[in-house]
């Protein structure tokens, strides 16, 4: 007599860029009768396809993917708005008896979707003052200030990401506490299995370099040109995306396209280290090797994690 299949719950496939999260998410959705919910902040933008490594319709293997292509490039990303949209979709899938497969490397977005997080409000006066300072002094100066006020937040936020630096400093001023202190403990609102895809750094760096080369060959520069005509340069969030920021700089004559490509590789490697550090701090993540030697075993091991009771 066979046992009943496990009741649907939320699966979060996390880890650094280029680790193989998207393919694993599709596999799990196909095997479990689930649907993918995007947790990559830059894949939320319409038209940002090549540079974000967004799966093509063919690569999605017939699996519905939610929260892709929902914002214009001029829209400023909001994790609070993402939280609302993601939970709406997760709740609907669970009500239908389907497995929500959250896939992405944006750590705060993943936590916003599955954890008991409430995001502090904004103060227009503080925000305006910090944005003026950002314009005058640049993100590096504000990042240095953040490193003093909240070293953990500074480690998690790229020094070039002025928008996120401003937000962290704003929250610190509003609450009188470090930005990271406003993130509560690991208190999930859903029964969630978190699977981290782990790739050794040398191999991951090779994958990143190869991925950037393929993006250039696939037409990233033309994609950025087209999006620039739609307001990409004015978009506070989208214009900072890896690859897009570097190509925009080249199109503005600030560097060559070859230099932009090399800087995209360097910046992506730095970003991958930050992603890895973020997810390593969460004890609920069950890490599985996504290295080339273990790639064939990864789907089976992930499925076995999901199909048995998981604590933590």
Curated annotation (Swiss-Prot):
Annotated residues for binding of substrate: 17-22
Site (Interaction with substrate tRNA) location in chain: 106, 127
SUPFAM superfamilies in UniProt: P-loop containing nucleoside triphosphate hydrolases
Pfam short name (any one): IPPT
GO molecular function annotation: ATP binding; tRNA dimethylallyltransferase activity
UniProt cofactor(s): Mg(2+)
Xref: InterPro entries: Dimethylallyltransferase, IPT, P-loop_NTPase
Enzyme class, broadest EC rank: transferase
Interaction with substrate tRNA: annotated span: 40-43
Highest taxon of the lineage: Bacteria
Residues engaged in binding ATP: 15-22
Alphabetical GO biological process terms: tRNA modification
Protein family according to the UniProt entry: Belongs to the IPP transferase family.
Entry-linked PANTHER family: TRNA DIMETHYLALLYLTRANSFERASE
Function: Catalyzes the transfer of a dimethylallyl group onto the adenine at position 37 in tRNAs that read codons beginning with uridine, leading to the formation of N6-(dimethylallyl)adenosine (i(6)A).
Family annotation (NCBIfam families): miaA
Record text on subunit structure and interactions: Monomer.
Protein's name according to its UniProt entry: tRNA dimethylallyltransferase
Organism this protein belongs to: Streptomyces coelicolor (strain ATCC BAA-471 / A3(2) / M145)
Taxonomic placement: Bacteria, Bacillati, Actinomycetota, Actinomycetes, Kitasatosporales
């Amino acid at each position: 007599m066979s046992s009943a299949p496990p009741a649907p719950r939320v699966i979060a496939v996390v880890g650094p860029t280029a680790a193989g999260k998207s393919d694993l998410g599709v596999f799990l959705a196909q095997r479990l009768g689930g649907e993918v919910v995007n947790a990559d902040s830059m894949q939320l933008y319409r038209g940002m396809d090549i540079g974000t490594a967004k799966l093509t319709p063919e690569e999605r293997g017939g699996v519905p993917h939610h929260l892709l292509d929902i914002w214009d490039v001029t829209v400023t990303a909001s994790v609070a708005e993402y939280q609302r949209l993601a939970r709406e979709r997760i709740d609907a899938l669970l009500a239908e008896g389907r497995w929500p497969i959250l896939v992405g490397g944006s750590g705060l977005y993943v936590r916003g979707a599955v954890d008991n997080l409430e995001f502090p409000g904004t103060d227009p006066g503080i925000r305006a003052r910090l944005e003026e300072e950002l314009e005058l002094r640049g993100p590096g100066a504000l990042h240095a200030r953040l490193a003093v006020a909240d070293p953990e937040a500074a480690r998690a936020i790229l020094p070039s990401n002025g928008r996120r630096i401003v937000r962290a400093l704003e929250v610190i001023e509003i609450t009188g506490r470090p930005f990271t202190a406003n993130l509560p403990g690991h208190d999930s609102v859903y029964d969630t299995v978190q699977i981290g895809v782990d790739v050794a750094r040398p191999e991951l760096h090779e994958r990143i370099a190869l991925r950037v080369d393929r993006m250039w060959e696939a037409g990233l520069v033309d994609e950025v040109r087209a999006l620039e005509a739609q307001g990409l340069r004015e978009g506070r969030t989208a214009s900072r995306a890896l690859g897009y920021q570097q190509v925009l700089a080249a199109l503005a004559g600030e560097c060559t396209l070859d230099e932009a490509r090399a800087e995209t590789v360097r910046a992506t490697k730095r970003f991958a280290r930050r992603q890895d550090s973020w997810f390593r701090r969460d004890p609920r993540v069950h890490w599985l090797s996504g290295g080339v030697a273990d790639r064939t075993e990864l789907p089976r091991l992930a499925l076995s994690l999901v199909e048995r009771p998981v604590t933590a």
